[in-house]
Amino acid sequence: MNAQDIIRSIEAEQMKTDLPVIYVGDRVRVGVKIKEGDKERVQPYEGDVIAMRNTGINRTITVRRVFQGVGVERVFLLHSPRIDSIKVIQRGKVRRAKLYYLRDRMGKASRIKPRFDRPL
């Protein structure tokens, strides 16, 4: 057993199996665990998936939303223990793998058309 096999076996133990199918363009709600003092709570973060990286345990999504007129992007490690839940709210119809052009658009120009042929 070489080093690569050992790394893969450790990563396989820590990977989550209950993740939904997520595509670029989807509107998602991510529940993030926040620790404040000795209490822990779940903070929802809702936005559009503008980028994805699919590399095993390092799988990430970049979620963008506009809050008080300012665009905010967060990158979430999907297999992180700090991620409590991920729920797909709406499927989006896009023709690109990365939606970085949405950074330059504001208001109605940054909307993504809904897609109805994929189940939630």
From Swiss-Prot:
This is Large ribosomal subunit protein bL19. This protein is located at the 30S-50S ribosomal subunit interface and may play a role in the structure and function of the aminoacyl-tRNA binding site. One of its GO terms (molecular function) is structural constituent of ribosome. Belongs to the bacterial ribosomal protein bL19 family. The keyword Transmembrane helix does not apply. Pfam families: Ribosomal_L19 (PF01245). It comes from Thermosynechococcus vestitus (strain NIES-2133 / IAM M-273 / BP-1). The gene is rplS. One of its GO terms (cellular component) is cytosolic large ribosomal subunit. PROSITE patterns: RIBOSOMAL_L19 (PS01015). It comes from the Bacteria. GO terms for biological process: translation.
